[in-house]
UniProtKB/Swiss-Prot annotation:
Protein name stated in the entry: Nucleosome assembly protein 1-like 3
Compositionally biased spans, kind Acidic residues: 157-178
Keyword Ligase: no
UniProt entry keywords in alphabetical sequence: Nucleus
Any GO MF annotation of the entry: chromatin binding
One Pfam family cited in the UniProt record for this chain: NAP
């Protein structure tokens, strides 16, 4: 009996010690304690069932099933909601680092500090690039000013400026080669020695040609010798005819007169032909003068067609050929964009936040009062620990537009519709303003909120806006002529494509 009592006392103590060890070894206190308490309850039930004997077997099975159901209920009640578990979950990298030995973790932290210093160097690199862009933009400014003057008919380029002056490219079109080639091509390097030997033969052949000309003259001289023989035969035939027809007699005095008449007839015809030619020459200028006078009289009421000044619609065509901007330009935007005289790019000054600004200069127009429309892009220039690869290049952080001072009834960014309300039973017409698709929405981008997130539609608009700003910055301002001529073909990235004057390219 004493031994049985000792066993009954020692078993619960052992189970209690085991429970304490399991609780201390586990990391999740709530779930592990629940499991330990459930295991203790099962152990107590098993110990009580062992003392009760085999007669209480069915009762023990029912108690075990009841304990499992109660355990599941406790687990469900104490389970942490999924969103909060996600919030508490640490990144995979930290979990991996936490499992490393302490000495290795210290070294990893030292590498993190080195990476922070590298990010600071990258920020200096980006600022240096910005300073270089500002420097070379000042060098390009005189060229951009000349481009502005030619487009807006303030300066007429000279003939030398209109010629293709590229040193890398040569004339290659067939027409230009035929026009510019001399009558005698210069000898090649291998043919310089052979040509002098061939030249005497050519000269000899050229000398032989005049010798043949006298032979031709001799043949021409021989022809008149045959003519008297023909005349003699004709005289003989005429004598035979005279003998055969003795009735017909001609006076010898009349024959010379007939010959004289035959000689005078060709002279008279030649004189008449010459007189007719002279009369035609005299009449042609008179007819031309009359035609020119009639044309002048007809053109008095019509204005003369003058050559266009400058390059009309230059920037309208350029923007329409830009990949992202072309679809934004509507038909009702084009008359406004015809007043666009220049698009310039300006960089922020030293000491200010890194940014660049596009200035759209407009001539006085009947649509809005602004002379310049501005769009500014702010660049991320500080390291961001949430984005470790920010230093791969420029990244636009935010953009700001400007307010357009539209004239009355000329705002193309909105449309006014009339909605009918029948709340009082009467039909009332109330105007309602609805946003409209337009290029000029480019100057009113969605604002990024300080707290919260943008809607998906606004977020997509902002992403596309950032792409447009990058294209304008990289390509359009510097190489607008290729967009005007259509050589870009509306594409942004075209590796291996050559630009320039197609007419004179090899």
């Amino acid at each position: 009996m004493a031994e049985a009592d000792f066993k009954m006392v020692s078993e619960p103590v052992a189970h209690g010690v085991a429970e304490e060890e399991m609780a201390s070894s586990t990391s999740d206190s709530g779930e592990e304690s629940d499991s330990s308490s459930s295991s203790s309850s099962t152990s107590d039930s098993s110990s009580s069932s062992s003392t009760s004997g085999s007669s209480s077997g069915s009762g023990s099975s029912s108690s075990s099933s009841g304990s499992t159901s109660s355990r599941s209920r406790l687990y469900r009640k104490k389970r942490v909601p999924e969103p909060s578990r996600r919030a508490r979950r640490a990144p995979l990298g930290t979990n991996f680092v936490d499992r490393l030995p302490q000495a290795v973790r210290n070294r990893v932290q030292a590498l993190r500090n080195i990476q922070d210093e590298c990010d600071k160097v990258d920020t200096l690199f980006l600022k240096a690039i910005h300073d270089l862009e500002r420097k070379y933009a000042e060098l390009n400014k005189p060229l951009y000013d000349r481009r502005f003057q030619i487009i807006n008919a303030e300066y007429e380029p000279t003939e030398e400026e209109c010629e293709w002056n590229s040193e890398d490219e040569e004339f290659s079109s067939d027409e230009e080669v035929q026009d510019n080639t001399p009558s005698e091509m210069p000898p090649l390097e291998g043919e310089e020695e052979e040509n002098p030997k061939e030249n005497p033969e050519v000269k000899a052949e050229e000398k032989e040609v005049p010798k043949e000309i006298p032979e031709v003259k001799d043949e021409e001289k021989e022809v008149p010798k045959e003519i008297p023989e023909v005349k003699a035969e004709e005289k003989a035939d005429s004598k035979d005819c005279m003998e055969a027809t003795p009735e017909v007699k001609e006076d010898p005095k009349e024959v010379p007169q007939v010959k004289a008449d035959d000689k005078e007839q060709p002279k008279a015809t030649e004189a008449k032909a010459r007189a007719a030619v002279r009369e035609t020459h005299k009449r042609v200028p008179e007819e031309r003068l009359q035609d020119s006078v009639d044309l002048k009289r007809a053109r008095k009421g019509k204005p003369k067609r003058e050559d266009p000044k400058g390059i009309p619609d230059y920037w309208l065509i350029v923007l329409k050929n830009v990949d992202k901007l072309g679809p934004m330009i509507q038909k009702y935007d084009e008359p406004i964009l015809k007043f666009l005289s220049d698009v310039s790019l300006k960089f922020s000054k030293p000491g200010q936040p890194v940014s660049y600004t596009f200035e759209f200069h407009f001539l006085p127009n009947p649509y809005f009062r602004n002379e310049v429309l501005v769009k500014t892009y702010i660049i991320k220039a500080k390291p961001d620990h949430n984005d470790p690869f920010f230093s791969w290049g420029w990244e636009i952080e935010d953009c700001k537009g400007c307010k357009i001072d539209w004239r009355r009834g000329k705002d193309v960014t909105v449309t006014t519709t009339q909605s009918r309300t029948t709340a009082t039973g009467e039909i009332e017409i109330q105007p309602r303003v609805v946003p409209n698709a337009s290029f000029f929405n480019f100057f009113s981008p969605p604002e990024i909120p300080m707290i919260g997130k943008l809607e998906p539609r606004e977020d997509a608009i902002l992403d596309e806006d950032f792409e447009i700003g990058q294209i304008l910055h990289d390509n359009v301002i510097l190489k607008s002529i290729y967009y005007y001529t259509g050589e870009v073909n509306g594409t942004y990235y075209q590796f291996g494509k050559h630009y320039g004057n197609k007419k004179y390219r090899k």
